[in-house]
Amino acid sequence: MATEAAPPRIAVRLPSTSVRDAGANYRIARYVAVVAGLLGAVLAIATPLLPVNQTTAQLNWPQNGTFASVEAPLIGYVATDLNITVPCQAAAGLAGSQNTGKTVLLSTVPKQAPKAVDRGLLLQRANDDLVLVVRNVPLVTAPLSQVLGPTCQRLTFTAHADRVAAEFVGLVQGPNAEHPGAPLRGERSGYDFRPQIVGVFTDLAGPAPPGLSFSASVDTRYSSSPTPLKMAAMILGVALTGAALVALHILDTADGMRHRRFLPARWWSTGGLDTLVIAVLVWWHFVGANTSDDGYILTMARVSEHAGYMANYYRWFGTPEAPFGWYYDLLALWAHVSTASIWMRLPTLAMALTCWWVISREVIPRLGHAVKTSRAAAWTAAGMFLAVWLPLDNGLRPEPIIALGILLTWCSVERAVATSRLLPVAIACIIGALTLFSGPTGIASIGALLVAIGPLRTILHRRSRRFGVLPLVAPILAAATVTAIPIFRDQTFAGEIQANLLKRAVGPSLKWFDEHIRYERLFMASPDGSIARRFAVLALVLALAVSVAMSLRKGRIPGTAAGPSRRIIGITIISFLAMMFTPTKWTHHFGVFAGLAGSLGALAAVAVTGAAMRSRRNRTVFAAVVVFVLALSFASVNGWWYVSNFGVPWSNSFPKWRWSLTTALLELTVLVLLLAAWFHFVANGDGRRTARPTRFRARLAGIVQSPLAIATWLLVLFEVVSLTQAMISQYPAWSVGRSNLQALAGKTCGLAEDVLVELDPNAGMLAPVTAPLADALGAGLSEAFTPNGIPADVTADPVMERPGDRSFLNDDGLITGSEPGTEGGTTAAPGINGSRARLPYNLDPARTPVLGSWRAGVQVPAMLRSGWYRLPTNEQRDRAPLLVVTAAGRFDSREVRLQWATDEQAAAGHHGGSMEFADVGAAPAWRNLRAPLSAIPSTATQVRLVADDQDLAPQHWIALTPPRIPRVRTLQNVVGAADPVFLDWLVGLAFPCQRPFGHQYGVDETPKWRILPDRFGAEANSPVMDHNGGGPLGITELLMRATTVASYLKDDWFRDWGALQRLTPYYPDAQPADLNLGTVTRSGLWSPAPLRRG
């Protein structure tokens, strides 16, 4: 190796060649780079394999030596091992006439649960036999008389992933059995028959007999922490990687080049465009729509601290989010301050501002002089960036950090190419790896590294002549692998592999060739394919297409830097291809392109300027394509997810203002194409002028030549105005914008302060004026309305059924998400007017008459006119502004009316006016019809119901209960912040003050309430959380009975905001089980048993 300085002319011609002594001065740096880099990489790679301290948990029963039921819902559904021993004499409590109601000696699920036999273990009396049933399989059966006989010693049961076995020790098979005289035992294998455990339940009471034992090893493989060895290795790995990067930097300085400043000049200054972008982002932070998964992620983050790891709370049996959980861990730390939406999304706002700063300060200057000096390019970049960011990245999902990570990775690579140094490459590897493991869509970040392989290989080749390959590659290898340390800091390699195999097996896990599903959703009239989302993607594709076309035609876009421009285009293409390999296909994944969209927008703006695209015809055709993209985008709804949709104009219809916007835009497209044809056939010059244009003409030309900038900013304006208008039109009712602005004043509980709950609907019943309570409902006229004129099953019709829903069916093949307690049924005892209909919302049949028009067989016309009911005074009406009637059936709103009258009018048999009810619920289930008391004149003192059912179709019928004025309290006051709550994943961000039920050591906390979104959202998200997917619904439906509580949204009475359910345990006296905890060291390859998959 040369020891003398290279000639100055060589330094000027080839800056990456040596200009300094590379011998003694850099020998230490070379050794450090090799040793520290290789050791750092080895330690990082070894991190997943190093041992951890696992907290073990054992569920033992009986507890306190008595027959007492305990709750222990396992988040993984099953124990790794289960051993049960039951003395035969313990079954004596099930025998005899005095124990007729006692049937279960021991079970892992409450016997009352609908799927108890299918999923759990029950040792129960069936007729005169004692039967052990495991997942709907009678494993072993013995006559109760033999069990209580002298020869029977005990029943033993063991369950492992590969087999389950049970035996009545002391008893033998009868003469008619397959093996007469053999021990009475049963066994099943070939399938995972381990029963689901939500506790240990029994119908017996009193002291437990000696020898009774239930021992379950809870699956706590993810409740682990690093051992001192692993902690030391991680610290050393990070330190060695840092040392290797320092050594690489020293080797980089051997080129003798002056250090370039890290930040561009005047990076801190702001212009008018910067101010506008900042203003839009900040305002959108308050009024803008959020993403559908914000509640999902927020709940995971909130629960993780107590749980000890970042579990996928809503699916996949509580397995961890790793390797994609590090970003969520940061959100968990952030949530320590507040869980309010404006606070939790503050990092997202910071990422948005950083993205724009990088685009405007780093990306645009690197793309060439034409891009740097073009105002059209800057405005198009800003418009494209906002058009993608606003609808796709204003939440807690990882797309914002991935979008930023892609930009920063590209900037690091470009710095490496520009300076011929390798430290920026190592930094790019770290940023790229962190971006990759921010979420599944982080796979898009690999493009930033792949597109620069050519120039980076050249740099490496030049420098390897002086330092060798290993001193240069080892630090980069350490940088590329160091992210394994935070990802596997407290988890093992085997555990993560099993978790990811489970997720793939349970699904959803779509293949690369299913990518068309993402685009099908993009073109559906739903929030997934809304105007904003559709335009964002189509505009990005258009910008990519024109940039590629111009680059292919002319080698590069005139006036741009060829290398950076090609790499930006390459990154985008590779990102689209990489997205094919994500396991789910949702349109919110396009949020990762926000930064690239701004960069491509700048390129596309220059590509269609007069200097680059001289043909007026071609520029006009491009403008026509932009208008067509607008037309195609407006052929959808202006829809947003859940509460973000409240009050938004055209949220359920195509935008229309006197005429259809999509049709008008399509007609405009045709006109612009005709103009292009005119340029082609008539005025086919290149459009160049020799005269100096006026200032007005120059500005007009700039606008005309920037159709993409105009379109993007029009869409940004449309989105901002839509959500601002929603907040204004909703006021004083709840909206996202109002809630976020109120949070600045300390009101941070969101929707919980505006949802009004009616705990006791019986208290608000209006009193009949003359007729007895039992007869008042039909006192005026009752033709074919009878107390039992209601079908036994009034389950609500599904509101949605989309392609792919079959992946999320419950065991009955039905889409879950209905409101329990509203599906009807019958009762054993008749109500006050002889009806046996089961009433919803805790209505008392002893005080609530009901009449319906349905009958078995041929239907007949039916009419109902109730007696008069007394209205409260005007002062009382002001405190309770709503009148409600609980109804069921399928009918039009005009068929059920409320009439009012004064005392004099009522006495004369006349009414003073009438109105229709607002029907918010889902037919034909029970729901609350609503009427605002403000619509009733203050002089009215009485009301009555009038119903007319002239439709003879069997599915068309009406059932009514008496009117009432609800006595309500806020959900925040009823549920509070202390009770454990099952927050559906769509509602988590809207209810930040409610405490989601936790889990620790593999056992879930038992929730007392469940909060659901609107019915559309409930049907969409409930299947994700069900038993098939390993979610909490598979636990709560076995442990508790859900009952819907009547609720209303303040000042927005006719809104389906969602539902509140009270969860009542099947065994109210059951207490949380005490677990026996321990600690054991496990290697990174240890596995206790396969994870349950169904």
Swiss-Prot record:
This enzyme's EC code(s): 2.4.2.-
Cellular component annotations (GO), alphabetically ordered: cytosol; plasma membrane
Keywords for the protein's UniProt record, in alphabetical order: Antibiotic resistance, Cell membrane, Cell wall biogenesis/degradation, Glycosyltransferase, Membrane, Transferase, Transmembrane, Transmembrane helix
Gene Ontology BP, a term: cell wall organization
Transmembrane spans: 28-50, 232-251, 264-286, 341-360, 373-392, 431-453, 466-488, 530-552, 565-582, 586-608, 620-642, 657-679, 700-722
Keyword Flavoprotein: no
Compartment(s) where it occurs, according to its Swiss-Prot or TrEMBL record: Cell membrane
Induction pattern: Positively regulated by the transcriptional regulatory protein EmbR.
InterPro entries on file: Arabino_trans_C (IPR032731), Arabino_trans_C_2 (IPR042486), Arabino_trans_central (IPR007680), Arabino_trans_N (IPR040920), EmbABC_dom1 (IPR027451)
Topology with respect to the bilayer: Multi-pass membrane protein
Biased composition (Low complexity): 817-831
Keyword Plastid in annotation: no
Gene3D superfamilies: 3.40.190.160, arabinofuranosyltransferase like domain, EmbC, C-terminal domain, subdomain 2
Chain segments carrying region Disordered: 817-836
Top-level EC class: transferase
Family to which this protein belongs: Belongs to the emb family.
Function: Arabinosyl transferase responsible for the polymerization of arabinose into the arabinan of arabinogalactan.
Note: This is one of the targets of the anti-tuberculosis drug ethambutol [(S,S')-2,2'-(ethylenediimino)di-1-butanol; EMB]. EMB is a first-line drug used to treat tuberculosis. EMB inhibits the transfer of arabinogalactan into the cell wall.
Name assigned to this protein: Probable arabinosyltransferase C
Organism name: Mycobacterium tuberculosis (strain ATCC 25618 / H37Rv)
Lineage of origin: Bacteria, Bacillati, Actinomycetota, Actinomycetes, Mycobacteriales
